[in-house]
Curated annotation (Swiss-Prot):
Its EC number is 3.2.1.22. GO terms for molecular function: alpha-galactosidase activity; carbohydrate binding. The gene is aglA. The active site is at 150 (nucleophile), 208 (proton donor). This is Probable alpha-galactosidase A. Keywords: Disulfide bond, Glycoprotein, Glycosidase, Hydrolase, Lectin, Secreted, Signal.
Amino acid sequence: MKALFAAITMAHALLQTQASLQNPNLLPTPPMGFNNWARFMCDLNETLFVETADAMAANGLLAAGYNWLNLDDCWMTHQRAPNNSLMWNTTKFPRGLPWLGSYVKAKGFRFGIYEDAGNLTCGGYPGSLGHEELDARTFADWGVEYLKLDGCNVFPEGGRTSEQQYEHLYGLWHRILSGMPHPLVFSESAPAYFANEKNLSDWYTVMDWVPRYGELARHSTDILVYAGEGSAWDSIMVNYRYNTLVARYQRPGYYNDPDFLIPDHPGLTMDEKKSHFGLWASFAAPLIISAYIPGLSEEDIGYLTNRDLIAVDQDPLAQQATLASRDDEVDVLTRSLADGSRLVSVLNRGNSSVQRVIPLQWLGLNPGQRYQARNLWDGTEKRIRKDLTVTVRSHATEIYKFTGSNGRVDAVSTGIVFNTASGNCLTGDAAGVGFAPCTGGEKQIWQVRGSELRPLSLLGECLTADGTRLSLRPCAGDEAQMWSYHISGNLKSGHEGGCLTEGHGVASCGWELNSQVFGLPSGVRVSGY
């Protein structure tokens, strides 16, 4: 019944609205800019935004592409006006938000704002529930072009489940914004309210519909705020991990948002700051800085304006880097770029320097060819033929762009196939096929050619559905060796339509079950869009 209801709801939504993915020109590349929340929280005002705009225009951030200035929570009064419209806090914004919008636009920025889908914002200010059309018109009248819609204080109504209530409200906002003469960029925070459950079915379900309604979605926990307790690096790694689980959703017009860049957080080393930026760029994620911009160091401005990495982030393919391999300390991520080159990012999660020798085949490249590898941090280049040898400091990320003799490479989608709930890797060798903790190595790295999955440990053999069992057999092109990857994260067999299932081989496909949702390498065709 759940699956039937969702199918009907999805079909109705597609008939009633124009999906954001069908209008990628609204936001053809991920947004870059500034938001006050992680650095200042509710301590925002006109002076902060004027000083931020002035500093970004002077220090090169605006010229580098950081052109959004977005207010977060607490900008409004605690009560609506007699006509039910929202009002800005005149103590914080004495000249008003229309004036502020005009000021930042005159400098070359665009203007964004925050609201909440519930009856109150997270900070206790008026939410938009019941006032959606009025608030949308108000924002447009003020010159707002971007709406971040949070999801605090959303309660089920009309017999809906919590997930259905969120879809109802965010779908309503999408219809309103899409019907405006100049639609606003729509940032959805709905998935974050389902991310920390042991049963991820509702989170997966919300992630299924947010690309239809908005241009980006905050999919998980908030990044650690400046005044917060705990490890800023650990917070970055939590959001990094969540982002690796949802690569299948991203494409031009919709972007997974792992939250703000925090370059002036006192708990981060320079390597950690650069990793944060470099990984987000590798993901083609939004690059929204939350920091005291006038106080950023020259070194911070230097890496934040790295032209090569910004070009990666803004690449028109918008392909998200995915895991080529993973072991106890090191993640290797790859993606293809629009110019035909291959991006390789190597993250050291461990607490000491490591060296890795990474075979080109792990990266989806041909070990018989020569490549030029450009280090995107310092611009140095080296020739690579058989493997990439790299030394990576603790919590650092090395990033390379591989090109062939004609500037392009013929990459094959290659990487781990992992269960996004357990984190375990599909593992195949002469001993059989199953799931195990990810430890790196050829038996956990798969080539995806068309509909076939082949482990690098046995490239002549294909993942095969033997009834409910999995095996490796010589590739013969029959239905039992054909697999299709779906937006739900299901990997479906061409033989009787069962789904890959951790712990059960192949089983009947359920509704967004933890055991049946998988991450695959970038470049694999995703059905269901």
